Amino acid sequence: MSFSVEVLAGIAIELQRGIGHQDRFQRLITTLRQVLACDASALLRYESRQFIPLAIDGLAQDVLGRRFTLEGHPRLEAIARAGDVVRFPADSDLPDPYDGLIPGQESLKVHACVGLPLFAGQNLIGALTLDAMTPEQFEVFRDEELRLVAALAAGALSNALLIEQLESQNMLPGSSGVFEPIKETHMIGLSPAMTQLKKEIEIVAGSDLNVLIGGETGTGKELVAKAIHQGSPRAVNPLVYLNCAALPESVAESELFGHVKGAFTGAISNRSGKFEMADNGTLFLDEIGELSLALQAKLLRVLQYGDIQRVGDDRSLRVDVRVLAATNRDLREEVLAGRFRADLFHRLSVFPLFVPPLRERGDDVVLLAGYFCEQCRLRLGLSRVVLSPGARRHLLNYGWPGNVRELEHAIHRAVVLARATRAGDEVVLEEQHFALSEDVLPAPSAESFLALPACRNLRESTENFQREMIRQALAQNNHNWAASARALETDVANLHRLAKRLGLKD
C-alpha cells in the first residue's frame, strides 16, 4: 500500500473543510489514522522543550491535557532532534509516551511508532506521531510519502500559529516580524465555557483596561491574569502578584505603595511597593475583596490619577500600571453591604471575566487529570502514570467543590497511594485510589481530638490539634485562607505563618 495522489488530495481537502484550527487539526489526524490503518495518531505543538497535544485520534482523552517534556520522553526528544522521518523499531528500548493510553489496549505496549517533525522554515513547531500495536504496520509506506504528509501538516500548523500570534497582538508595531509561537499559559480546557473565556481573554488582553476576574476558590484565576498579561503589550515588563488576603492591616499600605526610611518602627531603609515594582507592567491583586475600606480609597486614587505616595513621604510618584484584580466574593453584594466601595468596583470591572467552576466544564476534568498525572510522573521519576477507564468515569461524576485545586491534590494523593501498592515504576490509577466526598466535614471535637494517635508531650498534642483545626477550616471554606482565618477568629497572616510552621504549606 502507498499514498496515491487521490489520498494526498483528500488530506489537503479535509484541511480546507475544517471550521477553525481545532476542527482542521482533528480532520487531519482522523484522516491519517484511517489512511495508515494505525491504532493512534496525534498532532503535537512544540514549545519550550515540550510537546503539547493539539489533536488526537485513538488515544485516551486525557492525552490532550498532558505536556510531554523532552527530558521525560526520549522518543519525542529523538523526533525533536531529527530533521526527517523517525522510525522506531518494535524492540526499541525507548519507552513510548502513549504506552497504556490506547483505549482497550491499556495493558499492552506500542510496537510500531513513526515520528514526523514539523518545521516552519528552520524552526521546529511540532510533530506528527503515528502508533500501532502491529510491529510492521508502517513498513509499506516510504519515507518520501510520509514527508509529504508532514509538509501538509506543517503548513496547516504554521498558518494556525501565525494567525493566533497576530490575533493575540504579539506581532506589535515595531517588532521584528519574526514568527514566535505564543507561550503556553497552562489554561487547559476545550469545554464551551473555557473556549468562551479564552476568547474573552484574547479580546481584553491587547487593551489596557483594568480587569476584574471572578470565580470560586481554586478555579485558576491567577492563570487568567497570567494569560492576559502575556497577551498584552506589557508582556515584556513585570507581572507582579499580591495576595490581599495575606496582608495584615499594619503593613498593607507599605506593601502596596512602599515606604521611606523612618516612616515607622522597623523601616530602616526606603522600600518600593508593588505598584513601583509593576511600573510599565501589570499588578495582579488577588482576593481584592479582603482589602479594608481605607486601603480601597487609596487604591482608587491610584487608578484615577496614576500616582502613589510612599508611607512617610509627601512626594508623589507617577506610575503606569495595569491592574488585574481577582475575587471569589460577589462584589456587588459587598458593595450593597457597605464592605466594598462602589466607585472602586466600577473602576475595576470595566471588563469583568468569570472563571467557570470545574463542575461546569465537562470533559475538561479528564484533560486536567492528564496534566496532573504527567506532572506526578516527572516529579516521582515514574515511567508512566495513567488513568483506568473506571477512574476517568469516577472523576467525571464527582462535583469538585474545591475545583481545579482539589483535582490536583486528588491526583497527587492517588498517585502516591497507587505507587505504594504496586511494584515497579508504572502506576495505573483506579477508582479506589480516590477518596472523594462532597460532604462538609464536621468541626473537630474533643472526641475526635482524643481519638488522635497518642502524643509524647503537650507541645506535640497542641500542634496536632492546631493542625486538625486548620485542615477542617480549610475544607469547610473551599481552601480559602481568608475565610478560614475568619472562621478560626484569627488574622490571616498569622494563620499562614502557623500553617507553615506546622508543615501544612510550603
UniProtKB/Swiss-Prot annotation:
Residues 187-416 form the Sigma-54 factor interaction domain. Keywords: ATP-binding, DNA-binding, Nucleotide-binding, Phosphoprotein, Transcription, Transcription regulation. InterPro entries: AAA+_ATPase (IPR003593), GAF (IPR003018), GAF-like_dom_sf (IPR029016), Homeodomain-like_sf (IPR009057), NorR (IPR023944), P-loop_NTPase (IPR027417), Sigma_54_int (IPR002078), Sigma_54_int_dom_ATP-bd_1 (IPR025662). One of its GO terms (biological process) is phosphorelay signal transduction system. Gene3D superfamilies: 1.10.8.60, 3.30.450.40, Homeodomain-like, P-loop containing nucleotide triphosphate hydrolases. The keyword DNA-binding applies. ATP binds at residues 215-222, 278-287. Residues 481-500 bind DNA. Pathway: Nitrogen metabolism; nitric oxide reduction. The modification 4-aspartylphosphate is found at D57. Required for the expression of anaerobic nitric oxide (NO) reductase, acts as a transcriptional activator for at least the norVW operon. Activation also requires sigma-54. This is Anaerobic nitric oxide reductase transcription regulator NorR. It comes from Salmonella gallinarum (strain 287/91 / NCTC 13346).
